[in-house]
Amino acid sequence: LMDNDVINLSGGELQRVALTLCMGAPADLYLIDEPSAYLDSEQRIWASKVIKRFIIHSKKTAFIVEHDFIMASYLADRVVVYTGVPALDATAHAPVGLLTGMNQFLKHLEITFRRDPTNYRPRINKMHSVKDEEQKAAGEYYYCGD
C-alpha cells in the first residue's frame, strides 16, 4: 500500500489505511465506526484481531459501532443492545457482557447461533431444527458450549 497514491487505492485499501491512522494516533478513547466497511470476510477477521490486540496491549478503551455480526463477535467484550423501532422509538440499554447481550438480541430475533467446529465462526441454526429448538429451550441463543 505504501507504494501507491491514496487516490488509486481501493475501498478496502483505504479502510485499512484509515484504521492504521486511527490507531496510530495517541488517544485514551478510540471511536471506530464500521471498521468492516469495504473489507472482505478474511480482511474483517484480520482487522478485528489487530484492533482487539491493539486495544488490549495499549490498555485503552474503544467504542466500536459494527453491524457485521461476525466482526462484532470477534471485537466485543461488552455490547449495547437497542430495543424498539429504529429511528422512531428506540432504547439503548446499559452495556452488558458479550454472551448476555447477544442472547438478548438473538432472542428478540428468534435466531440461534452455534460455533462452527472447523473454523469457530458463528453459524445460524436452521429455524426449528433440533439444535435451534434445544438452544431456545435452554435460553442459549448464542454459542452454547460446543
Task: Cite the ranges covered by each PLM segment.
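Walker B catalytic motif
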Residues: 5, 32-36, 42
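Hydrophobic anchor residue at the start of the ABC signature
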Residues: 17-19
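H-loop/switch region of ABC-family ATPase nucleotide-binding domains
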Residues: 65-67
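Conserved beta-strand-loop-alpha-helix hinge in the C-terminal portion
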Residues: 81-122
